[in-house]
Amino acid sequence: MTTVGTALRPNATRVMLLGSGELGKEVALECQRLGVEVIAVDRYADAPAMQVAHRSHVIDMLDGAALAALIADEKPDFVVPEIEAIATDMLVELEKQGQHVVPTARAAKLTMDREGIRRLAAEELWVPTSDYRFADGYDAFQAAAEAIGFPCIVKPVMSSSGKGQSFIREASQLMAAWEYAQQGGRAGAGRVIVEGVVKFDFEITLLTISAVDGIHFCAPIGHRQEDGDYRESWQPQHMSELALQRARQVAEKVVTALGGHGLFGVELFVCGDEVVFSEVSPRPHDTGMVTLISQDVSEFALHVRAFLGLPVGAIRQYGPAASAVILPELDSDNVQYANLSAAVGAGLQLRLFGKPHIQGKRRLGVALATGLDIDEAVQRAVSAANGVKVSG
């Protein structure tokens, strides 16, 4: 039986968030709703989740010793990674000593880089993936690209939000793509993955929850990517029953192999009735922000419910809904938002993340909308997001 203590009391149930961005902020809010004490951690001060947590700390989360010292000091019941750039080897060691890592330290380690999860999916679980090769140096990268064939895609094995990623059409682009990949990795220059291009009709995120009452699925989420990062997402994404069945089979196989309880964002390519595995995040997914308006229980609430050991039960999806990001470009430590009235109303909601700094382009919020169909929902969300005026 799950029990929850009282925040800021000796019997408190404590959750430590490793990563305090917009996704972590929503997880923190859901923890707060259940009376859970929240400790938010990130590499910079005043991150979004820190603004709604009981306490916060600024550390280099890739520093294993610093991370272990903080966990020893705070003694959280649950360590909840919300980003990939964490000293996962230390999490594995702490888990062996009895620390609860969500969903598991192994899941955090395998999904920190593309190589771990790709080898698990393709070579151990035998789920369909794109053709791929890994390379450490330019010569090996060139050979990998030639073996895969053109066009192909190169990505650092450790990167996110499209950083360091290139679409290569011909051999003359290899050097530029290699240099860009070396700049985009979370840990600096290093290993890359070269992938063959998959012919697909659309991409989906299948939010998959592993809980005490089994495996659960949200309705599939479609999304549009630009520069390697999502711009709009919508739910439900229409697909054939056979494709949906296959997507669920792949997602369940991957999630079960990673283990633990929590929500996983499983990314898949869909072409007709066929599905191809792309990536998985063992945590809420940015495209899943649409669930803040599209479901009775958001992806963030589902994640918290699952890792606390509570049953998920049925998930109600309300109908066509969409999200669109607010992505301004400016330099400021004092951001201001205007024209907000156009972004709220019946079936129209706004989330501003409260990020304290922007330098260049940065996702600062999201507009959420419902509609009579997906096209209308997306149009309403995009219009609302574009209407928000950001200055600083």
Curated annotation (Swiss-Prot):
Domain ATP-grasp residues, every copy: 119-308
InterPro entries for the chain: ATP-grasp, ATP-grasp_carboxylate-amine, ATP_grasp_subdomain_1, PreATP-grasp_dom_sf, PurT, PurT/PurK_preATP-grasp, PurT_C, Rudment_hybrid_motif
Residues that coordinate or bind ATP: R114, K155, S160, S161, G162, K163, G164, Q165, E195, G196, V197, V198, E203
Reaction it catalyzes: N(1)-(5-phospho-beta-D-ribosyl)glycinamide + formate + ATP = N(2)-formyl-N(1)-(5-phospho-beta-D-ribosyl)glycinamide + ADP + phosphate + H(+)
Enzyme class per UniProt: ligase
Hydrolase is among the record's keywords: no
A GO biological process held by the record: 'de novo' IMP biosynthetic process
EC number(s) recorded for this UniProt protein: 6.3.1.21
Statement: the UniProt record of this protein carries the keyword Ligase: yes
Binding residues annotated for Mg(2+), in chain numbering: E267, E279
Entries under Gene3D superfamilies matching the protein: 3.40.50.20, ATP-grasp fold, A domain (3.30.1490.20), ATP-grasp fold, B domain (3.30.470.20)
A single MF term (Gene Ontology): magnesium ion binding
PROSITE patterns attached to this UniProt entry: ATP_GRASP
Keywords (A to Z) from UniProt: ATP-binding, Ligase, Magnesium, Metal-binding, Nucleotide-binding, Purine biosynthesis
Binding site for N(1)-(5-phospho-beta-D-ribosyl)glycinamide: E22, L23, E82, D286, K355, R362, R363
Pathway(s) this gene product operates in, as recorded in its UniProt entry: Purine metabolism; IMP biosynthesis via de novo pathway; N(2)-formyl-N(1)-(5-phospho-D-ribosyl)glycinamide from N(1)-(5-phospho-D-ribosyl)glycinamide (formate route): step 1/1
GO CC terms of this entry: cytosol
Family: Belongs to the PurK/PurT family.
HAMAP family reported in the protein's UniProt record: PurT (MF_01643)
Complex and partners: Homodimer.
Protein name (Swiss-Prot/TrEMBL): Formate-dependent phosphoribosylglycinamide formyltransferase
Species whose genome carries this gene: Erwinia tasmaniensis (strain DSM 17950 / CFBP 7177 / CIP 109463 / NCPPB 4357 / Et1/99)
